[in-house]
UniProtKB/Swiss-Prot annotation:
UniProt-listed GO biological process terms: translation
InterPro entries: NA-bd_OB-fold, Ribosomal_uS17, Ribosomal_uS17_bact/chlr, Ribosomal_uS17_CS
Protein name: Small ribosomal subunit protein uS17
Signal peptide stretch: none
HAMAP family linked: Ribosomal_uS17_B
Pfam families noted in UniProt: Ribosomal_S17
Entry function: One of the primary rRNA binding proteins, it binds specifically to the 5'-end of 16S ribosomal RNA.
Keyword rRNA-binding recorded: yes
GO cellular component: cytosolic small ribosomal subunit
GO function terms (MF aspect): rRNA binding; structural constituent of ribosome
Source species: Orientia tsutsugamushi (strain Ikeda)
Keywords recorded for this protein, A-Z: Ribonucleoprotein, Ribosomal protein, RNA-binding, rRNA-binding
Family: Belongs to the universal ribosomal protein uS17 family.
Amino acid sequence: MPRRVLQGQVISAKSDKTIIVSVERRFKHPVYHKTVKIAKKYAVHDPDNLYNQGDKVKIIESRPISKTKCWHVIEDKGQ
């Protein structure tokens, strides 16, 4: 099974070696036919503490690192 790759924005970089990334998803509601935005937060491994709040990053699914972390940063998309 291929590993998922998502793109989002860093919303918190306060923890050591961990950043919180918000990934926004849009879809059309099946009943009301309105475009709906859903945001989900992911705990992402950042071993060198390179990323700050507001950075856009691309993340990839990986093996579990802790109870909540199973994602790594693969690319910095700028600000």
